[in-house]
């Protein structure tokens, strides 16, 4: 008899990746393609951004740029990358300083502080450039600090090329035809998409952005409610050679689809997951995609959006439940 092998991980960072995929069954009326969701809320701290947080930190360590217990990691974030950095920083011994628009959800701020991060909030009207400028200002005043720069750091898409893409190919037994993913930094779509296109020359990649801020489609930056995508700029890490088409989704569509995922699929996801699902359903209804398999990335779980408009109606109901 083979000796039992211990499968206990050395630390929490070894739990990153290998997230499951599941078919959507109950919100796909009218779809001629199958849709499978890759559940990135199953990461240790509930988002896809933990992959790139680990990838960027390891890359900097390998290059001798940072040292645990000595270096400070500084980053501009809408929340989830910051949470990934804070979680890994806690596990490895790094101080983490983050800049974030004040409009991001309360849950994000609480989680970051609970993980020991230092958080600086900026005026949301200044957009992504506002948090980048603040991060650069902090970095300039702190020796032994580094900005990881997720929007342009090549280890971001490379992490998805090494992990997310191969996982999708493996777990679909090579049957996947289409990838749908929201565009924040562009890393998930570009890295995973490049790997999958190398495996299948006919593979298609669809990006998702808010209708209200459709910059990648040639529009102007605007205000929207889909936290994590639609940053109001074209990120350096977005590879247009990988991207086949951009699907626009309104904030209302994203929120309503996220609600349906909870009510009909039992999947409590964030607003950007709702946006990705709404886009995937649009693609799955196209006649040319009959019989194909679409994989859609669900970037984060719903718990960190409880204070947002996504759960406004049920939050009000919960606060007014009668005592019987």
Swiss-Prot record:
Fetch the Pfam families from UniProt: PALP
Point out residues bearing the modification N6-(pyridoxal phosphate)lysine.
49
Which family does the UniProt entry place this protein in? Belongs to the cysteine synthase/cystathionine beta-synthase family.
Q: Which residues bind pyridoxal 5'-phosphate?
A: 80, 184-188, 272
Source organism per entry reads Arabidopsis thaliana (Mouse-ear cress)
Q: Which GO terms describe its biological process?
A: cysteine biosynthetic process; cysteine biosynthetic process from serine
Q: GO CC terms for this protein?
A: cytosol
Q: Which CDD domains match?
A: CBS_like
Quickly give the catalysed reaction. Answer: O-acetyl-L-serine + hydrogen sulfide = L-cysteine + acetate; hydrogen cyanide + L-cysteine = 3-cyano-L-alanine + hydrogen sulfide + H(+)
Gene3D superfamilies linked to this entry: 3.40.50.1100
Q: Which cofactor does it need?
A: pyridoxal 5'-phosphate
- PANTHER family found in the cross-reference section: CYSTATHIONINE BETA-SYNTHASE
Q: What is this protein called?
A: Bifunctional L-3-cyanoalanine synthase/cysteine synthase D1
Keyword Transcription regulation included in the entry's annotation? no
In short, the EC number is: 2.5.1.47, 4.4.1.9
Q: Which NCBIfam families match?
A: cysK, cysKM
């Amino acid at each position: 008899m083979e000796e039992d092998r211990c499968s206990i991980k050395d630390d929490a960072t070894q739990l990153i990746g290998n997230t499951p995929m599941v078919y959507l069954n109950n919100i796909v009326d009218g779809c001629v393609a199958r849709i499978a969701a890759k559940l990135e809320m199953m990461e240790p701290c509930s988002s896809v951004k933990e992959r790139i947080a680990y990838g960027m930190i390891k890359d900097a360590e390998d290059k001798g740029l940072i040292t645990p217990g000595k270096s400070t990691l500084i980053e501009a974030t809408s929340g989830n990358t910051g949470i990934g950095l804070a979680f890994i920083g806690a596990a490895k011994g790094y101080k983490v300083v983050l800049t974030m628009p004040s409009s991001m959800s309360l849950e994000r701020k609480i989680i970051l502080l609970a993980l020991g991060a230092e958080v600086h909030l900026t005026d949301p009207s200044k957009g992504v450039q506002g948090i980048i400028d603040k991060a650069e200002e902090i970095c300039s005043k702190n020796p032994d600090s580094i900005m990881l720069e997720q929007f342009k750091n090549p280890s971001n898409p490379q992490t998805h090329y090494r992990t997310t893409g191969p996982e999708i190919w493996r777990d679909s037994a090579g049957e996947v035809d289409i990838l749908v993913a929201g565009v924040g930094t562009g890393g998930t779509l570009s890295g995973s998409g490049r790997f999958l296109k190398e495996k299948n020359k006919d593979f298609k990649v669809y990006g998702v952005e808010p209708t209200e801020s459709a910059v990648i489609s040639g529009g102007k930056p605007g205000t929207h409610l889909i936290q994590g995508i639609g940053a109001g700029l074209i990120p350096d890490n977005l590879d247009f050679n990988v991207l086949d088409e951009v699907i626009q989704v309104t904030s209302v569509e994203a929120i309503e689809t996220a609600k349906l995922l909870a009510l009909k699929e039992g999947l409590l996801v964030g607003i950007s997951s709702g946006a990705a699902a709404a886009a995937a359903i649009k693609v799955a209804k196209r006649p040319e995609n009959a019989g194909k398999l679409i994989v859609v990335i669900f970037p984060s779980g719903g718990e960190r959006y409880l204070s947002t408009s996504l759960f406004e109606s049920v939050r009000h109901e919960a606060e007014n439940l009668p005592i019987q």
